[in-house]
Amino acid sequence: MRVKGPSSKKHKKKILKLAKGYYGQKHRSYRRAKEQVMHSLNYAYRDRKDRKRQFRALWITRINAAARLNGLSYSQFINGLKKSGIELDRKILADMAVNDMEAFAKLVETAKKALQAA
């Protein structure tokens, strides 16, 4: 007769530990817990990738709003920054737009000058 032994118990214990906090049978029954943990890990993997897209979209929205307050659209602002040789990423630009409006306004002016010169 085959004995499943400690490794099987260890695996089940690990799955049930990962399922802690789930509702109903999903944290008590090994079969349901295993299925839910598998889905949860897939969702976590997918959403780690998605989070990067969402943050970039948020940064672009913030930059666009601040640039429009200073008389430029987002695309014109980014184009002006590239032409003037300023290489700041969108995360830093969005932070400046929210926390340091004076510095951001100076960047917009620099971008405007670069657009007019070109």
Swiss-Prot record:
One of its GO terms (molecular function) is rRNA binding. GO terms for cellular component: ribonucleoprotein complex; ribosome. One of its GO terms (biological process) is translation. The keyword S-adenosyl-L-methionine does not apply. Belongs to the bacterial ribosomal protein bL20 family. HAMAP family: Ribosomal_bL20 (MF_00382). Binds directly to 23S ribosomal RNA and is necessary for the in vitro assembly process of the 50S ribosomal subunit. It is not involved in the protein synthesizing functions of that subunit. This is Large ribosomal subunit protein bL20. The gene is rplT.
